[in-house]
UniProtKB/Swiss-Prot annotation:
Protein name stated in the entry: Tol-Pal system protein TolB
Domain of life of the native organism: Bacteria
Gene ablation phenotype (knockout): Mutants lacking the tol-pal cluster suffer delayed outer membrane invagination and contain large outer membrane blebs at constriction sites and cell poles. Tol-pal mutants fail to complete division and form cell chains, and fail to process denuded peptidoglycans at the septum.
Assembly mode: The Tol-Pal system is composed of five core proteins: the inner membrane proteins TolA, TolQ and TolR, the periplasmic protein TolB and the outer membrane protein Pal. They form a network linking the inner and outer membranes and the peptidoglycan layer. TolB forms homodimers. Interacts with the peptidoglycan-associated lipoprotein Pal and with the C-terminal region of TolA. Interacts with the trimeric porins OmpF, OmpC, PhoE and LamB. Can form a complex with Pal, Lpp and OmpA. Interacts with colicin E9.
Cell compartment(s), UniProt: Periplasm
Lineage: Bacteria, Pseudomonadati, Pseudomonadota, Gammaproteobacteria, Enterobacterales
Residue ranges of coiled coil: none
Length: 430
């Protein structure tokens, strides 16, 4: 774990230009429906003020998941510095059955020890459900906080935490030599940096399953092209630059293939490239437009958008052959799906009655639940644990990023201050 904390994102920081973060999570609704939990400010054992509010990071992570409602600090019945100091009755009286406490200690070599304990207030005093400690340098303190959040979240829900993940997105600003930027940040908007700047539009970033590369669309050559960029060194590999449209890249879960849409023969159709050999094969054909592929977990089947029935709907096709099967039936049109990592559901843009929102469809039953309530919602991307969706929506004359939990109860915004933000893509586990 300590080794992971030191190197997990080192390859990114080596070359990337780090920016002052422009994106922060702003809670809109739903936090009150989460499970109450206590997160105490971590005890600082050094001089002056603590270099980072680790307890605040943990509380924010748990709140952002939509599954927890951390008690406001002003209402904490006590501020224990260790598990032994937790008084169960004081917390149980507030309906809280779990409390996170922690300590941050400076080391002579300039590093820090970060420790936490998850305390069960329903058991004997000092009963610890989970605990860990990490030795990190100052720049990794936030990462240590996210690590603690992941472990607490998994212990209490049985679901792997996704707080150490990242998001990629495109920012468009007005004026300047490079008005389009592909950026990456922590899932909560911190530690933002630029992957690529361009005078021409950038679109549709997609993560490789190991998190080391991004595929995206660029127009820098005068027409659309698909490229894959390695984050560690910035190396760019051009994948496709055929006449007309090249777009909608999607890595297969096993990392061996890239699906995308081309219109080199007229209509948009799906193609799959074997990344080792570079060989491309066509998956769909016909006069309809077929685009926006997303993989099922088996790396053999795709969900995609097609207008073969008139309006856009989501279909499923095996890349080895066979006729596509329509899988969306509710609403006037459905498109731009993202299938969950377990293959049990997908999120998509669903339009009905003049409204365009993010919806979730159970792939076994076909049941659909509308998740969002913002305006002109598009490009949904699932967190790797399937608990949250990031998407873009229109606000005023521009576009912003939004979060919604996949149960629809929790909603938040990630407002940007320096431009329109589009095409969000949630990373795999890192």
């Amino acid at each position: 774990m300590k080794q992971a904390l030191r190197v997990a994102f080192g390859f990114l920081i080596l070359w990337a230009s780090v920016l002052h973060a422009e994106v922060r999570i702003v809670i809109d609704s739903g936090v009150d429906s989460g499970r109450p939990i206590g997160v105490v400010p971590f005890q600082w054992a050094g001089p002056g003020a603590a270099p980072e509010d680790i307890g605040g990071i943990v509380a924010a992570d748990l709140r952002n998941s939509g599954k927890f409602n951390p008690l406001d600090r002003a209402r904490l019945p006590q501020q224990p510095g260790s598990a032994q100091e937790v008084q169960p009755a004081a917390w149980s009286a507030l309906g809280i059955d779990a409390v996170v406490v922690g300590q941050v200690t400076p080391n002579p070599d300039g590093s820090y020890n970060v420790a936490y304990q998850l305390v069960d207030t329903g058991g004997a005093p000092g009963t610890v459900l989970a605990q860990n400690s990490y030795k990190v340098n100052k720049q990794w303190l936030r990462y240590a906080g996210h690590t603690a959040s992941d472990e607490v979240f998994e212990k209490l829900t049985g679901i792997k935490g996704a707080f150490r993940t990242r998001i990629a997105y495109v920012v468009q600003t007005n004026g300047g030599q490079f008005p389009y930027e592909l950026r990456v940040s922590d899932y909560d908007g911190y530690n933002q940096f630029v992957v690529h700047r361009s005078p021409q539009p950038l679109m549709s970033p997609a993560w490789s399953p190991d998190g080391s590369k991004l595929a995206y669309v660029t127009f820098e050559s005068g027409r659309s092209a698909l490229v894959i960029q390695t984050l560690a060194n910035g190396a760019v590999r051009q994948v496709a630059s055929f006449p007309r449209h090249n777009g909608a890249p999607a890595f297969s879960p096993d990392g061996s293939k890239l699906a995308f849409a081309l219109s080199k023969t007229g209509s948009l159709n799906l193609y799959v490239m074997d990344l080792a050999s570079g060989q491309i094969r066509q998956v769909t054909d016909g006069r309809s437009n077929n685009t926006e592929p997303t993989w099922f977990p088996d790396s053999q089947n795709l969900a995609f958008t097609s207008d073969q029935a008139g309006r856009p709907q989501v279909y499923k096709v095996n890349i080895n052959g066979g006729a596509p099967q329509r899988i969306t039936w509710e609403g006037s049109q459905n498109q731009d799906a993202d299938v969950s990592s377990d293959g049990k559901f997908m999120v998509m843009v669903s339009s009905n009655g003049g409204q365009q929102h993010i919806a979730k469809q159970d792939l076994a039953t076909g049941g659909v639940q509308v998740l969002s309530s913002t305006f002109l919602d598009e490009t949904p991307s699932l967190a790797p644990n399937g608990t949250m969706v990031i998407y873009s929506s229109s606000q005023g004359m521009g576009s912003v990023l939004n979060l919604v939990s996949t149960d629809g109860r929790f909603k938040a915004r990630l407002p940007a201050t320096d431009g329109q933000v589009k095409f969000p893509a949630w990373s795999p586990y890192l």
